[in-house]
Amino acid sequence: MRFQLRSELTRKSTSALIVWFLFGVVVFPGCSTQTTLPADSAAGGQPRQRVEDVPQPAWGIATVSVACARENPGHKSELGTQVLLGHSVRVWKKSGSWYEVETHDGYRAWLELGTFELFSAEAVNRWQHANLAIVTALETVIRERPDGQSDVVSDAVIGCLLERISQEGTSCKVRLPDGRQGYLPASVLEDYADWKKSRRPTTDAIEATARQFLGRPYMWGGNSPKALDCSGFTQQVFFLNGIDLPRNASQQAGCGAPVTLTPDLSHLCKGDLLFFGRPASSRGPARVTHTGIYLGNGNFIHSYDRVHISRLGEPQAGPENQRRRLPIAARRVLPHLP
């Protein structure tokens, strides 16, 4: 049956059940905290626009490969997070062409209309129950025809969600949330429901996934293959292995179980999350400012300048504790490890 979306908002309440697109299948209760951002501050010196509540329930779906959500309405505002194509958001407020949205992990930031579309609760529910496929290649393109030479409809990155229409040879015809259609190699897609069921997070799988991102640039607020900040990197790696983490490093530091840190690192296992920053002292509590994934033998992978592998304790320029890469905490989130 052909799936069709209507871009709309409804002023009526609905009993339709909206199932959030959680970025994985393992969720740690109590980890995710909602970050409510100021909605009525002027961004980057731009003229202040009136902020209005949006009639509820209101939803949206990202319609570009990576939609950039900013801390305040306006292009000059700081990047807060990113939303991948085909993923839904809850919509709360409006300021001009900008909408305050809430992502699956509770993060609130502002998306510009055009990078996402507004949909009713019923339309989002239909999308979530369509024949969805997830992109499994780091980067790919959707073309007008299955020939590899026609014009590009959109790019896509790993984790994007598309509706699968049909397969034609080695190509797959897909539909985007806004109704656009195109083709991409069938080899870069996997049935989303099957993909979620097949996630088996192991230490080797975590390492292999993390290494796919080596060399990708750092960008504050980024959590896509195009560019990632430290916690966006760890969130993506674990999402691709079926584990859902909160957005920020300080929130991730509350997930899983604590791991004792000793000079010989004997308690650490591959796949553990490492946290860096200011340790607790008489001057104040501990403050997490950076995170990475332990690989074993004193090595860890993280996004700083770019995604790369560092060695614990190696000297680096910058503030003492963080740049010497001495962790102040570690957490174990892989469920099968002791």
Please tell me what each predicted stretch does:
Residues 1-12:
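N-terminal secretory signal peptides that target proteins for export/translocation
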Residues 16-30:
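Bacterial N-terminal signal peptides
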Residues 39, 47, 148-150, 190, ...:
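Aromatic- and glycine-rich peptidoglycan recognition patches
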Residues 218-232, 236-270:
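Catalytic cysteine-centered active-site loop
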Residues 33-57, 87, 95, 102-136, ...:
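Boundary regions of SH3-family modules and the immediately adjacent low-complexity/disordered segments
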Residues 77-80, 153, 200-204, 224-229:
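Soluble non-cytosolic domains of exported or imported proteins
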Residues 93, 166, 277-278, 304:
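Conserved "cap/hinge" positions at secondary-structure junctions
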Residues 52-55, 62-91, 135-164, 218:
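Beta-loop motif signature
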